[in-house]
Structures are given as structure tokens and as C-alpha cells.
Amino acid sequence: FNMEHDVAAARIIFGCGVALVQLPCAGVVSEFATSGPELECHLRGKNKLCDYLVDLTKSEAEKYAKGKAWTRIIWDVTAVAWLLDGDFEEDYLVHSPIPGYDNHYVLDPQRHFIRYVYHVKRDSLFTDLFAKLGRS
């Protein structure tokens, strides 16, 4: 998502050789979603922060769901999770791709390596997140 908004910047970051971890949105980070009932079950009544987060998330979701079932992806938590513990996500090394202006990658096996996250352990990460928020 972020990359398609500034491909030129992405090409610089992916090409400069800096240590880089890529967390793809579609099919990877997008799996880290929660629902109203899940938030109610695990956060409601734990403390003021938890109640605020439940209320805010449900309020925002209702703006687009309008009474239908919904889930919310908690994008930013996955980046922090990679830094915290290698057990929340699975990754491997790949040659740094070249982001194309057509929303595709050009692959070059001569380029430096980056770390590519291919799986978020959703339940483990939410269990940890809910426990930490509940202690706040």
C-alpha cells in the first residue's frame, strides 16, 4: 500500500543496501485483523485504555460497515512485532526487488538481500498484544 504511493522513494530504499524488512500488506499483514466481538471479549473492562481502543475501533468500523460484519487490520503492530520477537512472524532472505511503476517487481539475483516476512502468526501476536494492553 505505502509503496504504490511513492514508487520513486521505494526504489531508493530497496536499492540503497540498507538493512530492510519488507512486510507485504496483501496476504501477509492483512491477516492481522480483529473484530468487534474479539475486542469486546479480550479488552473490554480491562482498563480505561482498553475501553477507549474498543470504542474507537468499533466507532470507526461502523462508519464503513453500517451494521454489517467487519474486521479491522492493525497494520502498525506487525512492524513492531518483528522487532520484538522472532516468534510472531516468519521470514526469509530474498534479493532486494526493484519496485516497478506498474506495481510489479523486477527481480535481479545480483542485488543485495533483504528480509521478507511471509507469515504473521496472528493468534500468538494478538494474545501477546491483548495481554500487554490489559496490563496498561
Describe the function of each predicted region.
Residues 1-4, 8, 14-15, 20-136:
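Conformational coupling and interaction surfaces
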